[in-house]
Amino acid sequence: MNHNQMNMHVPMNQVAGAPNVAMQMPVPGPIMQQQSPQQMQPAPVPQQTQQDKMDNISKVKSLMGSLRESIPMTLKSAAQILHQNHNADSNTQKGMDNPVPRFEKNLEEFFSICDQMELHLRTATTCIQQAQSAAHYLPLSVIASRLDSGPTTQETTLSYPQYLKTVGLQISYAKDIHDTLVAAAQNISPPE
């Protein structure tokens, strides 16, 4: 089965446990069951490599499972609150014995996951843009070693200290151009 397809055939659970209520909600397996806050914590992840820890796209992919669990929980708690309010308004419910999960808490968790995903995606976008700019303005590859291992004989690579020196020269060159343009603009403008 393709992971992008969702199973549309799901069992139905009754809302708020009331057997005489005709309103039913789809429940995809154990995700929709009430869980205590301790059970909602993600299981400990096995030790990942250093590359996986720094990869923002991997972090977004790992948050997708939490997001898929959070959406139904948020919608279920909202539906239960609406159903409970409807029963209270129509006086069909004797008492408020069934505790309703906190909608605000579920909604906050959902938005928290969305914010984390947005942060990781923006960071990944920024990293890609910086890599493209670096490749455009400095088409040489940089050796990741921080120590200068002497002059490089290859014309297509730079050591890290050479890279830092090149970047420093580019920054000072851009600053000199900026200062020259500011001075020229001041010379052109009439004195007040």
From Swiss-Prot:
GO molecular function: transcription coregulator activity
Residue ranges of the region described as Disordered: 32-51
Listed GO CC annotations: mediator complex
Localisation: Nucleus
Family named by the database record: Belongs to the Mediator complex subunit 29 family.
Function: Component of the Mediator complex, a coactivator involved in the regulated transcription of nearly all RNA polymerase II-dependent genes. Mediator functions as a bridge to convey information from gene-specific regulatory proteins to the basal RNA polymerase II transcription machinery. Mediator is recruited to promoters by direct interactions with regulatory proteins and serves as a scaffold for the assembly of a functional preinitiation complex with RNA polymerase II and the general transcription factors.
Protein name (Swiss-Prot/TrEMBL): Mediator of RNA polymerase II transcription subunit 29
